[in-house]
Amino acid sequence: MRVEIDYKPAVPAGPLQAAEIQRAIDIVHQSGGGVVSIGPGRYIVTTIFLRSEVELHLQRGARIQAHHDLTSYPVLAATASNKDQSPYHLLVGQDCKNISLTGDGIIDGQDEAFWEPCGRVEDRPYGIFRFTVRGGSCGRPSPLVQFVRCKNLKLAGFTLVASPGWGLHIFDCDKVSVIGLTVRGHRYGPNTDGIGINGSRDVRISHCDVDTGDDAIILKATNPDSRCERVTVTNCVLASNCAALGLGADVCGLIRDVVFANCVVRRSLRMIQVEMWFSGRVERAIFTGITGRTLPDEGVENERPIYVDIQQFGRPDPELGQITDLVFRDILCESRGRIVLTAQDGSRIDGITLDTVVITVPEIEDPTVTVPRSPSLQLSNFNPETRSVRAAVVADNVHRLTLRNVEYRWPLGGSPTMHAFCCRNVTEFIDESPRLRSNPDQLNRIQFIGEQNANLYLPVQHQ
């Protein structure tokens, strides 16, 4: 069955327009399934619920726009405890099968309708503002589009813009396909993540273009019994003022069997990140064929082409997360920053391979200056001896580390001085990277901290 909806300017914006679309979706669902096609026009709506066996298709020229009045939205149960998640959403699919959201139309979250400026960044181009959520973190639809416990979910073609918080959140779903989405979020909005995959299985993301202020594509497992596994992210173009591609930091459950491949990063702060703030696990993740830069347009400090970290994050629970078997292969990045692989004492990263990783450095960011003055929690905060050390590659509490054909291309005459590698509590380390040199070359290539480094195979040594 196919239902066509034509935009009617006489219909008041908000709940009435949402009710029209909802009525069509429910009719198709009750008739056994089909397509609801939204024609060109601007639809200012509150929450719309997708149903099993129904495809909501947004034609080119259709714009689904979030109504600014949260009192018109239903209050929904949260899927996880997180300050960035509110009980309000624009499009929701919950406990559905064979559900689709497709088309060339636009989903518009009207971000600034829910924000207020909290300070001007005078040294940034164009006087860009930073924003905070008006009325507290729950005073916005976030995630804007959310799917919970759905099976056979297809998302294709549409554009998602101006989300007031998280953009697309896929929670505890199975057999998910995300193809050809365009996502645009404010660079200085509060937690404007692009695509979040949370505790979901058999997920394929491909050919997406994501440009956001917070993480572009991120995998999580926020509930202790959740599993985020068998996920591929391929052929995407990304930009972020945080992480372009990543796992964590909210991992209370398990993330495993993940591949990120053939992606281009226009700009980022951290091109690739794997973070553990809770006591979950990450196992078997591959990052391959990724090229780009960690040069944020607005000069955000503490760039890192690759960042892996385990920390307690101020929790009273002393149990720490686990990271096992990460591979970074065929990575090219222009960056001012370091590769940082750290774990808080009492934990360790077990099994990391960097193979054919080439970092071109236009100028060197001095971590002894930039790290101490940053309030960020994403700076190896529980590794005081290494978090600001001057070295291209920093490893702290790492077991089974292999560096093969890793290269840092320093700027001619660049300062400050940088060791090629710094290790603390590193065991079973294989160094096969003759082009990983210190700056200048006369400086000791490797800096050892502490007495717990052991079983180091170092055929490459200049100093």
Region roles according to the model:
Residues 1-463:
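Extracellular/periplasmic carbohydrate-active domains that bind, remodel
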